[in-house]
């Protein structure tokens, strides 16, 4: 008796894009998605005001977020910087037939994500301290004290125990970082 061929679409990996504030995670993710239409991005749900700007996210109130937690909507959720963040279970639908699904995660939740997602990789985006300082000051979302706190956290190491981690330096031209990240993603697929 022969076993029928598996015709289900392949599931792409979940690719966490991590790094300190101002390093260019969202710009890198956008550039990668433009370069490869099968590389998808997952929007985070955040208890941040909609007018805060920056990344593309789904803003919700604290009460709405808690209701989503209780309804088991999230594959992963965490607290950071006085806000709550969630990755909806819909990420699994995005993985079907995808090169991968990019998601902006906090370094503190990476080990948990590695347990939640069966095919999980990390791209750690870095930049020189002076580049981070200029970018944080330029975006105007944080006051001077918060910029200093974020710069102090920029050098924090990733947690030990992650299986697939790759570093991309985004100190220079964004296009160079995109090419570097594309090469990493393609090499992982080979």
From Swiss-Prot:
Its EC number is 2.7.4.23. It is an enzyme of class 2 (transferase). SUPFAM superfamilies: P-loop containing nucleoside triphosphate hydrolases. Keywords: ATP-binding, Nucleotide-binding, Plasmid, Transferase. Gene3D superfamilies: P-loop containing nucleotide triphosphate hydrolases (3.40.50.300). GO terms for molecular function: ATP binding; ribose 1,5-bisphosphate phosphokinase activity. It catalyses: alpha-D-ribose 1,5-bisphosphate + ATP = 5-phospho-alpha-D-ribose 1-diphosphate + ADP. The keyword Nucleotide-binding applies. The keyword Nucleotidyltransferase does not apply. Catalyzes the phosphorylation of ribose 1,5-bisphosphate to 5-phospho-D-ribosyl alpha-1-diphosphate (PRPP). HAMAP family: PhnN. This is Ribose 1,5-bisphosphate phosphokinase PhnN. It comes from Ruegeria sp. (strain TM1040) (Silicibacter sp.).
